[in-house]
Amino acid sequence: MGKYLDPRADLTFKKIFGEHKHLVISLLNALLPLKDDECVESIEYWPAEKVPDRPLAEKDSIVDVCCKDNKNREFIVEMQMTWTDSFKKRVLLNASKAYVAQSKKGDDYELLQPVYALNFVNENFMNDVDEYYHYYHLVHDKYTDKVIDGLHLIFVELKKFKPQTFSERKMQVLWLRFLTEINENTREVPAELLENAEVSEALEIVERAAFDDAEMRAYDKFWDNVSVLKTLENARKREIEAAEKAKAEAEEAKAKAEEAEAKLKQEKFETARKLKVMSVMTTEQIAEATGLTAEVIEGL
């Protein structure tokens, strides 16, 4: 095992961003769509009982850090190791719960503060677009400057991220490089990461030497569970694909059979018409020859 552990794991991610307030503040300011006067200045972590419950099947694939700032804005930061079709809806549900939980009976609705859900996803889920950063919020369909400030959902597809030089988004690039480039195989850390005080501190936190044996067992178990969940999810997807393929093939076979039946029926009609015009056979004989009823033949 190398010098560093993967920062995306439950143990490491929470140790970095769940125990060091200034680092999660830096991450939020770098990744959230905040204006200059909206930057996060201080935060308090949510108490354990407030953190959303996870479905049993997803408990080992989701890492989260939850907090609120001095303006009472709520922040849910998640690292999603495997993608499921229900993930976006679950993110929306948990953000909505956090928003509703602010309201107390008799309170002024103006006191409600926005909720930001920042989600790092380790699998691509929008394969038809190149961008890695996806921001959803409540905006007027026609007048896009008209916004209802309440729920802000951000999804970052880590596999799509390519390190480039963005001077206006320097910290965003540095944090994403940290999350995508640092792992157990890292032998040499890029100078840009070491030169930044906050990222350099995060690097020290994920050094292998900083973890005891019990923590390493938990770390290894996390990745084992992720592998199992990925295997199960891939198997589920294959089953769905196989079922959809079988359904499509059955529908195609049915359509071909119906087409062949309609063609055969039309041929019988044409044969019956010709025989009727020739007047060489009785209606009963034509019916016997074509399989059509006498009533149908009479109507031709």
Task: Name every feature range the model reports, one short phrase each.
Residues 20, 24, 167, 235, ...:
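Hydrophobic (often cysteine-bearing) scaffold residues that line and stabilize catalytic clefts
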Residues 26-27, 90, 174-177, 201:
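Long, highly charged amphipathic alpha-helices
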Residues 75-80, 173, 180-300:
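Short, charged alpha-helical interaction segments and adjacent helix-coil junctions
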Residues 150-173, 181:
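Extended serine/threonine-enriched, polar tracts that run as long, contiguous segments within proteins
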